[in-house]
């Protein structure tokens, strides 16, 4: 019943919305006309709402005005007072966002000027960033340690100059062991302050020199000569077997010829 009487009231004032042309670019909706707020409501509408909700003492009688609201006491030095947020005049709002909007277009030129000032100081920064950085470990290096004065080119192999003490210790080790194990090689490298690669190369060269001094055949040459002798002996055996096989049929033919003569 309450809703039906509410809808059937002919004196109910419909809300009036302004046309779309009055909207500004900042999506600000202007206020309604003072006539919309000043008109009194119908008694029947108030009567039904008084039955549902208890009435308030000063809500219907007191008229609020945006310009007559007292300003609260604000401490000094705390920014813009609250009166700037209230409505002044005939619906012209005083918004605190206006200084921000006015200052915002000025900030990008300042940033652009700062970038323009920074670019002359480093003109080659963009050119260097485009070129890939090539580190020393990305190139092939034959030396064991990286030289501090590396200029980007591949250095040549340098011949290791062993000291007299290092050569003496290596000769002693070679006298007892011509071939080193990995563990013994690491121990000698730490003792003589050399790398494992240098120890390995020195022992390879020393073994070749020892074979040359003692006139020992090379391992590869000896294996090829032994394989050649094996092939020659196998060929001789095959030839002998073929000779014996060819001689046997001749003897058989001679015996058969003798038997034929006796029969005649």
Curated annotation (Swiss-Prot):
Gene Ontology BP annotations: anterior/posterior pattern specification; embryonic skeletal system morphogenesis; positive regulation of transcription by RNA polymerase II
Assigned GO CC terms: nucleoplasm
SUPFAM superfamilies: Homeodomain-like
Superkingdom, taxonomy of origin: Eukaryota
Disulfide links within the chain: none
Principal subcellular localization: nucleus
SMART domains cross-referenced by the UniProt entry: HOX
Name of the protein this chain belongs to: Homeobox protein Hox-C4a
Gene that this sequence comes from: hoxc4a
């Amino acid at each position: 019943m309450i809703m039906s009487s509410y809808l059937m009231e002919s004196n109910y004032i419909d809300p009036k919305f302004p046309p779309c042309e009055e909207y500004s670019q900042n999506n600000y909706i202007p206020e309604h006309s003072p006539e919309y707020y000043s008109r009194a409501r119908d008694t029947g509408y108030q009567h039904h709402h008084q039955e549902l909700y208890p009435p308030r003492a000063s809500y219907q009688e007191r008229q609020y005005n945006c310009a007559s609201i007292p300003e609260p006491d604000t401490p000094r030095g705390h920014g813009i007072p609250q009166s700037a947020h209230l409505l002044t005049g005939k619906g012209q709002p005083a918004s605190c966002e206006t200084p921000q909007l006015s200052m915002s277009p000025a900030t990008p030129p300042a940033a652009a000027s700062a970038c323009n000032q920074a670019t002359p100081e480093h003109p080659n920064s963009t050119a260097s960033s485009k070129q890939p950085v090539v580190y020393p470990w990305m190139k092939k290096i034959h030396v064991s340690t990286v030289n501090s004065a590396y200029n980007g080119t591949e250095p040549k192999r340098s011949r290791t100059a062993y000291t007299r003490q290092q050569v003496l210790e290596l000769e002693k080790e070679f006298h007892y062991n011509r071939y080193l194990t990995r563990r013994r090689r690491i121990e000698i490298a730490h003792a003589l302050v050399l790398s494992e690669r240098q120890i390995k190369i020195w022992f390879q060269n020393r073994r070749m020199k020892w074979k040359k001094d003692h006139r020992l055949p090379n391992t590869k040459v000896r294996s090829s000569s032994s394989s050649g002798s094996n092939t020659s002996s196998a060929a001789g055996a095959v030839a002998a077997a073929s000779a014996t096989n060819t001689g046997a049929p001749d003897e058989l033919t001679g015996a058969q010829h003798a038997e034929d003569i006796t029969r005649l």
